[in-house]
Amino acid sequence: LVAPGQAVQIDKRVVVLFNGQQGDDLWQSGQDAMVQSKAVSLDDAQAAQRAYWDAYWHTSDICIEPKDESMAEAVAAEQQGIRFCSFQLAQTYNGGSMRHNIGAKGLTGEAYNGHAFWDTESCCLPFYLFTNPEAAKSLLLFRYNTLPMALERAKMLDCKGACYPIATLNGDEACPLWQHASLQLQPSTAVSYGIWHYVHLTDDKAFLYRYGAEMLLQIARFQATRVGFSEKIGKYGFFGVMGPDEFHMMVNNNAYTNYMGMRALRYAADVLDAMRADAPEAYAALCEKVELAPDEPAQWRHIADNMYIPEAPNHLFEQHDGFFELPHTDINSIPVSEFPLYDHWAYDRIYRTDMIKQPDVLMFLYLYNSSFDTETKRINYDFYQPRTIHESSLSPAIHSILAAELDKMDEAASFFGYATRLDLDNYNRNTREGLHITSIAMAWANIVYGFAGLRSDDTMLRFAPRLPERWKQLTFSVMYRGRVIAISMGADKTVFQLTQGDKLAVQVYGETVELTDEPISVQRQ
């Protein structure tokens, strides 16, 4: 019995374990882990936790300073928002398992049933590429480990190769809506893009030839059997699809789907050519394993070279065939009480206008940014931005990044504020269902790709820093091939310095700059 006024301390130990076991085996593993945990005291655990986060914030913190006192409160909210986002990403996934992916809600809620989407490769991967490259590799190895399921899924769609799922826990397609599960091809091309992005930034040829090439080959096979040839225009295209904009279904020649399919087909053929020259034994083994026909890579190139990309003479891409003919809806005329539209409009009504749920054309202009000139991006941004309703939480950050590139800094700052505080301020009134983890990843990209102007799809890293009006300074670091690049942005200049690793050539405002362990200052242009 406890006497009055007597204090009692109770130590509680909890073991959370997942190793694929079931029943008695899992129970015994838990008991063993509990015994092992007793060798660690609370003080030890706290010290290890503190050391982990100290190391993380040392290389991954993002600091924002206000221009003056009148802006301090607003900037403090943005500072809190971006640190919240960074913390949640690091907590959600650290690369410790190749059997798990990043669910749309991470570990914070039950919405989406824990499923991972193509957001992993298109939105989350850049964060890990520049803060924890091994974790980025583990995310791609999840896709390799689930390749057998993707092969089976393609067969269900009467195709060859690998069709990765739109929603999954373990590699199987888990989306119950056929119009999403069967018509959205972007998961497969996102995996191809993710492999390309990872290898492009790390030069990890061992991964590429051991794991990546097989995935790329099977994705290309799927694309080559899912594509169709139009006799009318004499070009290949994808028919009966749904692009990233889920407000339009069963469309033909979605620009994103066609463009990303073209890139996936071409990259697979390029990798096989390089592999045959650099690693002939691995190439021969792969060809035997997948029974590659000698003419397949050439056919992929032929399709890619003749892919229809719906582009108007003024460089405005038509989102899909007939999009320019759709009735226009003024987004500002829709009462706030009718949002979200999925809850208030008839399902088919959403499909009958030129209103867009999230970036579609702008999405591939963002992913392969260096392949398009500034004027093309400006024309498409000016056309599609007013038509986008942002019912996807990923949408604002993509627009902010492109707006910053186009020097539309007021728009960029406005979109950024939404992206960083989406869950903290419960903008979508659904934070109770869990955090928007993949949107949180885009908030990080909003800083690095948006205001710092980083582009990672060219022959070298490129920067074009542009600071929002109310900020005095922005500082952060990124990791790249064993280096840590510290960046301090001011209104008039940006200072670059390597705090780890050998010298590195980058481009800043189009000019080549050599980074060393000495600070180098570049004037704002």
Q: Where are the regions a protein language model picked out?
A:
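Acidic/histidine-rich catalytic neighborhood
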Residues: 222-292
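Non-catalytic C-terminal accessory modules of carbohydrate-active enzymes
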Residues: 373-381, 385, 393, 398-525
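Carbohydrate-binding/catalytic loop surfaces
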Residues: 103-115, 158-181, 235-254, 321, ...
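Structural helix-adjacent loops and short alpha-helical linkers that scaffold large soluble proteins
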Residues: 64-79, 95-97, 130-140, 199-214, ...
